[in-house]
Design a protein with these regions (language model features):
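RecA-like P-loop NTPase motor core of helicase/translocase proteins
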Residues: 1-178
């Protein structure tokens, strides 16, 4: 866990990333296509949908693992459905099973969780399995352990305020636990 903290803070060299990720639980399989191919695919989709083309791929700050994929759509146009379906497709195509959704408010967090509940049967018919979503709660560290160790498609839904919370049970996401 300390290595994970140091890596997140940029203290440890990025060469430890893969080794570290394999030692702390399930992780998504690296994509077997190049960054240039991913960027070209992204540009093709953006062009087809009259969206300004990206000039580069975005990654989490300080890491060379994964991509920051942002879905920006007007309210009520199917954003949540789109990213839930994208999770199933990423699982089908690449075996990805870990996703984190960060939302700006508690109300949106609850709405996203509800969307997983109400679309569960629909996606079960299409993909023959379900996603296991949970809402991050600092007083329930076992949920994070389950998320990391479960081989099924798992989604952690967290609101940005959880990163700034204070108190005895707050910020457990950054703490070393038993």
């Amino acid at each position: 866990i300390n290595k994970a903290k140091q890596l997140a803070q940029g203290v440890v060299a990025n060469t430890l990333e893969l080794e570290l990720m394999e030692n702390i639980g399930y992780r998504n399989t690296p994509i077997q296509i190049t960054d240039n191919q991913i960027l070209e695919n992204l540009k093709r989709v953006q062009f087809a949908n009259d969206i300004p083309e990206s000039t580069q791929l975005e990654r989490p700050k300080g890491l060379n693992l994964g991509y920051n994929l942002t879905i920006e759509m007007e309210t009520g146009t199917g954003k949540t459905y789109t990213y839930i379906r994208s999770m199933f497709e990423l699982n089908k195509e690449f075996g990805w099973s870990k996703f984190i959704i960060i939302v700006p408010s508690i109300a949106i967090r609850e709405g996203v969780y509800k969307s997983f509940e109400v679309t569960q049967d629909h996606f079960q018919e299409i993909y023959q399995h379900k996603i296991t979503p949970f809402i991050y709660n600092s007083s329930r560290p076992q949920d994070i352990e389950n998320f990391a160790s479960d081989s099924r498609i798992s989604v952690m839904i967290i609101n940005t305020q959880a990163f700034n919370a204070t108190g005895k049970d707050a910020r457990r996401i950054k703490m070393e636990l038993d």
